Each structure stands twice: as structure tokens, then as C-alpha cells.
């Protein structure tokens, strides 16, 4: 079990973040139209998994916008914005913001994702949500970069995540 902080207060996070060089765990989450979306649906594409507690928070919204802008300049790359938000809310956010390179996905039907990716918040006021993390995958779903952000209120290391795609 990993530990992160929320405003400096310790929070326990269950599961283990996938290791660089490992094959990413398969998953099936819920898209904005309530249909299942799997990692395999994007076979052959590079992926940035922007895992956030909720798109209704400023830092989560900012990271989603920044990754959308960054991958607009890259070929064969998609951003998954993964949270426990309901698919309707996540879809509305991406549509309203014009985030064409982001696929919003919800964990609300599958808590297994949180454990498989080491982002299952177990304690504190955000228990049940996903911790902030970024996992970058190549076109064959090998992990190129993985960061569990140590302070939930802080943004991820964009430069390190995007450098993994170069």
C-alpha cells in the first residue's frame, strides 16, 4: 500500500502502480455514452492515462486540459481521463472544454481498475476515488512512464510523462 498526501495529511492508496517496462493491466471502463471501453479498443495507439480523483476539481481539470493540448501535437496518441466521475459529467466536461484528444472514462462499474493501477484511495475524505497518477503506454501497452503524484492537490510531472513519448 502506497501513501500520498492530501493537503499534507497522509492518505493510504491500495494496489501497486504498474512498473516501467511492464505490460499494462487490461481494463474495461465506462465511456461517456455508458458503453464499455477497453484498453484493447485502442490497440496500436500510444496512451496517456491521466488518472484523477474528479474532473470537478481545478487540478484535475487543468491536467486534462494540458494533456489534451500536448497530445494534439503528437501522432497516434490518445489521452484517457480516468476518474470515478459519472460518465455523463466527464463527457460534459470534455465536450464543453473542447477536449478532442481526451477519452473520458469512469471507474464507477469496475473498482478493480483502481487496485490494478495502484490508485485506490483507502482512507481520508477522498476514500473510494482514484489517486492522481499518470501512466504512459506505448502502442503495445508497455509502460513507458508511471507517476503516483505524492500530493493529491499538485499537478503531475507533465515533462516527464511527455518525454516518455519522444
UniProtKB/Swiss-Prot annotation:
Disulfide bonds join 60-94. It comes from the Bacteria. It catalyses: a hydroperoxide + [thioredoxin]-dithiol = an alcohol + [thioredoxin]-disulfide + H2O. The keyword Oxidoreductase applies. The active site is at residue 60. Keywords: Antioxidant, Disulfide bond, Oxidoreductase, Peroxidase, Redox-active center. Transmembrane segments: none annotated. SUPFAM superfamilies: Thioredoxin-like. InterPro entries: Redoxin (IPR013740), Thioredoxin-like_sf (IPR036249), Thioredoxin_domain (IPR013766), TPX (IPR002065), Tpx_CS (IPR018219), Tpx_Peroxidase_subfamily (IPR050455). Residues 18-166 form the Thioredoxin domain. Its EC number is 1.11.1.24. The active site is a conserved redox-active cysteine residue, the peroxidatic cysteine (C(P)), which makes the nucleophilic attack on the peroxide substrate. The peroxide oxidizes the C(P)-SH to cysteine sulfenic acid (C(P)-SOH), which then reacts with another cysteine residue, the resolving cysteine (C(R)), to form a disulfide bridge. The disulfide is subsequently reduced by an appropriate electron donor to complete the catalytic cycle. In this atypical 2-Cys peroxiredoxin, C(R) is present in the same subunit to form an intramolecular disulfide. Belongs to the peroxiredoxin family. Tpx subfamily. HAMAP family: Tpx. Homodimer. This is Thiol peroxidase.
